[in-house]
């Protein structure tokens, strides 16, 4: 179906918009026909060649020479190459599990011992620092546990003392109450005995008067 003829059949003219104030030209779209990533400028640099720079830096630190007698190639490393990011500080490198290296055709015949010594000393110093940090952390944790135990023991002893003081106060109140009741009963008995004596004396007087 031809879209142009279809629109002309409804009264549309070429070069005019469908409505008043509408677009007279179509929206231009840039088609991407290459296989590069999004956001890449056409004709620009595809990316920084970081791998080439790193490879060249490693090659500069290597000394490759041939032996005149045997005709073999000697592979020596002059300096220990330091990485840009330290293994201890990088959070991604901590979870990285290092596997076996790829074996090449060139054997390490004349490798110097100084580079290996530097690497081993650095690794040993890192291990010592980690051990010291772990020991310090353990000491701090032990001190905190001791403080918590002391505070808990002090609180328990205070609670026990409060309970004992409450019990003693209750016992003292009970003893006072019992002593007060005993005094009241004694006072009542003394009053009754006095009344009884008065009645007996009055009865004796009456008997004497009758006689």
UniProtKB/Swiss-Prot annotation:
Residues 198-211 have a biased composition (Basic and acidic residues). InterPro entries: PINX1 (IPR050656). One of its GO terms (cellular component) is nucleolus. Residues 140-149, 158-176, 185-197 have a biased composition (Basic residues). Residues 115-211 are annotated as: Disordered. Residues 116-125 have a biased composition (Low complexity). Keywords: Nucleus, Ribosome biogenesis. Coiled coil: none annotated. GO terms for biological process: ribosomal small subunit biogenesis. It is found in: Nucleus, Nucleolus. It comes from the Eukaryota. Disulfide bonds: none annotated. Forms homooligomers. Associates with ribosomal complexes. Trans-acting factors of the ribosome biogenesis process. This is Protein TMA23. It comes from Saccharomyces cerevisiae (strain ATCC 204508 / S288c).
